[in-house]
């Protein structure tokens, strides 16, 4: 067994090492005597037996007695859990269990004795002691320990020898304790011990700290294991939880292993018994302060987020109210100050952003968030936003983290996506609750107030030059970029509907006041009582269901009454409004019908309108007015060309421009920002100058500036804006904007450079068909024009005047057209398939009049033209060498005669064999002759889909020397002409119906002459040959 990977013996009756340790893990409690008798060991009993017995017993008899006594004592261990009440755990064996590699495996396999042993409070207390050991809490990083260990091994080689002796002594002790095993096990054990001694020479000795770290890790794995008995035993002893939570009282920084153990154990307990665990957590004093001491510890803060996520709208737990009462949000904002370290500031900012994401206002019922709550409402309150802005103005990491928080707040709390819009609610119909969506009115107002401070910070920030391979450049810097990003996001926020409603701010304030009055009545004691009630209801589901049913019934009755009242109150007025609005629409339509332009409107952008909007500005307009007064948008626009290589900045500037040009024009202050962008900033001139500067730079260095992509996008926004106002027939009272858009240099740029760039952007990658026309395309176009021209205008077509032209210039595109027309005679749109068969053929675009769908009114004319075209092609083919009786009689090569139909420029002719005799031989001729094979054979090709092969007859037993001859109108007509010798029977004016009659007659003649043709060895048979497709030529 020494060379086998299987480490267990073949005898399945042998116990595992864990089971052997557990045999001595229980001590029976003797109620009559004060002494406790261990059940798993019999050392004291053996000593008494040796004193009372004679010294003449043999050693073998003593061993047998010891074995029998051990087996009897093992059998005395209880088999049920209730019987273990008379036993206490032997804590001396706990270290041996933790050192065993199979402990966790035995635990997950539900080892009965192991579960009973680990459930004892004393054992659990010892495991928690391992996790909360001061050496674990104070341990240094592994990187600082490893050099000391290696250095100690090199300086003190005696440690290795001592370790070897210790292992030998352990091996001898292990051998004495396992005397009952067989000899083979002894041999394998000796070999393994020798191997372990040899390998231990190269390994450093395990220090005491490493042993304790390993045992702490195993103890944490046991306490966090998915084993119900252990978790339930911990929850029944609150003192154990209190000792575990003492980790939070340790001064920062807390080692990552200790915090990881804490998080794993508590998450398991929280999932197992959420009510009991929350009751314990909320009963802790200064919960927020203890967590914020370790705010830069990700494991602890993640666990706090998980605790917060348990407080959902449909099942509140009171966690949010407790955290608000302990001022979680103000204390987190304090940690953003520069007086804290950069890591602490970033950790606090990341926690706030994660909490905002968790509190997303989403109408999706499947969302895992908790929705808006009092903590996020406190975060966007006037006091907290003012505090955050003052911290951000200090610059550095504080500004960066603050901008990230503001962006997350705006993106996750867009009032336009609220399930119920605030402006359509009343205090009676929708009473305010602590779960109402939050509004960003205070946020926008305060940033509008402090906009000059951010503008000064943007202008005053200067950084030293940075060396680059193409020269020295000034870096943008993190602060300036974050300010630009903040302005773009605030501009997004100012366009929300709620912030541009006249009564929006007033409605929000009324609801905030009413909500504050209701929340003042609640206290922390009531919250804890609610948690206890939830715990009791957890075990009494019937009562809960009954109460919920009664409450739902009452709510339904109340809702029905309130809805009826609302209908009674608002029904008449809504009907009146609808009638008035309909009347206005009708009146507008009448005016439009009488000649009045519906979209002929004038935009009021005069100074009087500007002053009127400034007197009583809405919340959204207040921010736009601040942006205009500080000229911060123009400063950001000037940075576009100052930092030509910063694409992050260019993307932000394009975002700002896109919002301005797509913003409202008839209402609000956005029209004046648009005027500033086009008139004051002279945006069109900046774009043209930037493009010219890039061209000059490219001539000098061969490089293009990095802003060219976003420059084109901004120019496209201006172009789309001009198209919009032209289409809607909008005009400005102040013609400055229109004048900027009508300037000659901008028109020239739009019609030349911008149009060319747009065309390049819209071109499919690798599609050069429109730019480069091959010679083959030229030949095909000229040939198709000649043929169609002859077909339409030459009355002598087919009489031999143009035979030479057709035989030499017949291109593959028209051949495709010809074959597709005949093969798809039963389909509805023959010409569509024919034209589409060759994408490169420009007849598809130039000769659209040949399609039936395009000229339904002239259907008869198009049909006759098709028939005339088919007849003329047929006569032309009769005059050439597709099938010639003279060639057949002379035994000439039908391949060479058949290929004369195709242009030599496109299709290589077949090389002639060196031996002339091979020309007359069929190289595909089978060695056996098959008789009785004809058109009447019922052979079915299993791979035939009915379209891939063109075969009217049997394809496998005919010679494939001739080109494919599909059974179509043309070739049936040709076959009839060849067999009957009547070359002049097909007239130019034959219709399609007449052709069908000829086809039927030619089919009968083909079947009668088939045997004769096969005997003559001609090539009128049909080969296994693919029909022509658009790739054939």
From Swiss-Prot:
Residues that bear Phosphothreonine: 990
Keywords, alphabetical: Cell cycle, Cytoplasm, Phosphoprotein
Modification note: Hyperphosphorylated in the absence of SIT4.
Biased composition (Acidic residues): 171-182, 784-793, 825-838, 932-944, 1000-1018
Biased segments, Polar residues type: 909-924
Disordered: annotated segments: 32-82, 147-213, 768-1033
Biased composition (Basic and acidic residues): 158-170, 183-195, 858-879
Role: Positive regulator of protein phosphatase SIT4. Involved in the general amino acid control (GAAC) response regulated by TOR. Involved in the dephosphorylation of the elongator complex subunit IKI3.
Sequence similarity: Belongs to the SAPS family.
Protein name: SIT4-associating protein SAP190
């Amino acid at each position: 067994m020494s060379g086998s990977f299987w480490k267990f013996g073949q005898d399945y009756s042998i116990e595992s090492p864990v089971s052997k340790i557990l045999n001595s893990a229980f001590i029976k409690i003797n109620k009559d005597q004060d002494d406790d008798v261990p059940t798993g060991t019999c050392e004291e009993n053996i000593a008494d037996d040796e004193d009372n017995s004679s010294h003449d017993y043999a050693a073998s008899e003593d061993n047998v007695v010891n074995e029998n006594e051990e087996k009897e004592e093992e059998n005395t261990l209880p088999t049920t859990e209730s019987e273990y009440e008379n036993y206490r755990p032997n804590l001396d064996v706990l270290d041996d269990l933790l050192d065993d590699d199979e402990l966790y495996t035995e635990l997950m396999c539900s080892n009965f004795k192991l579960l009973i042993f680990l459930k004892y409070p004393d054992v659990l207390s010892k495991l928690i002691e391992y996790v909360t050991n001061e050496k674990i809490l104070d341990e240094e990083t592994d990187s600082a320990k490893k050099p000391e260990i290696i250095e100690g091994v090199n300086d003190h080689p005696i440690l290795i020898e001592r370790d070897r002796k210790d292992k030998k002594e352990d091996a001898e002790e292990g051998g004495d304790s396992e005397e009952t095993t067989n000899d083979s096990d002894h041999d394998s054990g000796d070999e393994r011990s020798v191997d372990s001694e040899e390998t231990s020479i190269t390994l450093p000795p395990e220090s005491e700290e490493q042993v304790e770290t390993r045992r702490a890790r195993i103890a944490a794995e046991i306490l966090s294991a998915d084993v119900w008995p252990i978790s339930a035993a911990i929850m029944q002893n609150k003192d154990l939880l209190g000792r575990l939570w003492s980790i939070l009282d340790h001064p920062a920084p807390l080692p990552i292993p200790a915090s990881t153990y804490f998080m794993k154990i508590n998450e398991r307990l929280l999932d197992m018994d959420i009510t009991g665990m929350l009751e314990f957590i909320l009963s802790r004093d200064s919960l927020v302060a203890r967590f914020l001491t370790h705010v830069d510890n990700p494991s602890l803060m993640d666990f706090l987020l998980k605790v917060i996520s348990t407080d959902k709208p449909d099942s509140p737990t009171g966690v949010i109210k407790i955290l608000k009462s302990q001022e979680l949000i103000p204390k987190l904002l304090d940690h953003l100050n520069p007086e804290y370290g950069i890591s602490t500031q970033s950790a606090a900012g990341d926690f706030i952003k994660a909490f905002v994401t968790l509190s997303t206002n989403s109408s999706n019922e499947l969302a895992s968030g908790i929705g808006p709550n009092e903590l996020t409402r406190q975060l966007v309150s006037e006091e907290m936003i003012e505090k955050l802005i003052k911290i951000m103005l200090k610059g550095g990491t504080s500004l960066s983290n603050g901008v990230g928080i503001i962006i997350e707040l705006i993106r996750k709390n867009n009032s336009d996506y609220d399930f119920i819009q605030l402006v359509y609610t009343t205090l009676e119909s929708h009473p305010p609750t602590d779960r109402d969506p939050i509004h960003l009115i205070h946020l926008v107002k305060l940033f509008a107030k402090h906009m000059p401070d951010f503008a000064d910070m943007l202008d005053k920030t200067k950084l030293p030059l940075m060396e680059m391979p193409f020269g020295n450049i000034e870096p943008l810097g993190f602060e300036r970029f974050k300010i630009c990003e903040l302005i773009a996001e605030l501009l997004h926020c100012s366009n929300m509907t709620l912030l541009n409603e006249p009564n929006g701010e007033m409605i929000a304030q009324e609801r905030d006041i009413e909500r504050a009055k209701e929340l003042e009545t609640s206290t922390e004691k009531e919250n804890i009582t609610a948690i206890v009630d939830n715990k009791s209801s957890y075990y009494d589901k019937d009562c809960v269901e009954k109460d919920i049913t009664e409450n739902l019934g009452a709510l339904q009755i109340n809702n029905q009454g309130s809805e009826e009242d609302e209908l009674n109150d608002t029904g008449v007025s809504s009907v009146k409004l609808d009638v008035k609005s309909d009347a206005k629409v009708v009146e507008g339509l009448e005016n439009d019908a009488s000649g009045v332009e519906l979209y002929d409107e004038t935009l009021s952008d005069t100074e009087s309108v500007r002053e009127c909007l400034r007197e009583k500005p809405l919340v959204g307009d207040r921010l736009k007015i601040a942006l205009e007064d500080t000229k911060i948008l123009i400063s950001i626009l000037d940075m576009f060309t100052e930092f030509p290589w910063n694409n992050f900045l260019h993307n932000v500037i394009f975002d700002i421009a896109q919002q301005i040009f797509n913003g409202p024009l008839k209402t609000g202050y956005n029209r004046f920002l648009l005027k500033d962008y086009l008139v004051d900033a002279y945006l069109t001139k900046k774009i043209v100058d930037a493009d010219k500067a890039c061209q000059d730079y490219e001539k000098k260095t061969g490089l293009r500036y990095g802003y060219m992509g976003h420059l084109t996008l901004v120019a496209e926004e201006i172009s789309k804006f001009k198209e919009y106002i032209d289409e809607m027939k909008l005009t400005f009272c102040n013609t400055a904007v229109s004048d900027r858009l009508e300037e000659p240099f901008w028109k020239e740029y739009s019609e030349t450079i911008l149009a060319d760039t747009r065309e390049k952007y819209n071109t499919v990658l690798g599609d050069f068909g429109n730019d480069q026309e091959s010679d083959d395309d030229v030949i095909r176009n000229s040939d198709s024009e000649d043929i169609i021209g002859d077909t339409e205008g030459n009355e002598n077509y087919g009489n031999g005047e143009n035979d030479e032209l057709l035989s030499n210039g017949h291109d593959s595109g028209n051949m495709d057209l010809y074959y597709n027309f005949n093969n798809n005679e039963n389909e509805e749109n023959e010409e569509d398939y024919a034209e589409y068969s060759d994408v490169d053929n420009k007849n598809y675009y130039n000769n659209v009049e040949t399609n039936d769908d395009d000229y339904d009114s002239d259907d008869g004319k198009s049909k006759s033209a098709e028939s005339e075209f088919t007849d003329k092609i047929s006569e032309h083919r009769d005059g050439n060498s597709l099938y010639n009786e003279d060639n057949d009689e002379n035994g000439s090569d039908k391949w060479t005669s058949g290929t004369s139909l195709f242009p030599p420029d496109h299709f290589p002719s077949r090389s002639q064999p060196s031996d002339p005799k091979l020309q007359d031989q069929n190289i595909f001729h089978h060695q056996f002759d098959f008789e009785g094979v004809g058109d009447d054979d019922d052979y079915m090709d299993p791979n035939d889909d009915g379209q891939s092969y063109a075969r009217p007859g049997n394809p496998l037993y005919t010679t494939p020397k001739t080109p494919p001859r599909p059974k179509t109108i043309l070739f049936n007509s040709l076959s009839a002409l060849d067999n009957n010798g009547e070359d002049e029977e097909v007239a130019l004016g034959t219709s399609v119906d007449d052709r069908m009659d000829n086809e039927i007659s030619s089919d009968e003649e083909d079947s009668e002459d088939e045997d004769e043709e096969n005997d003559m060895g001609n090539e009128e048979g049909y080969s296994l040959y693919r029909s022509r497709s658009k790739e054939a030529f």
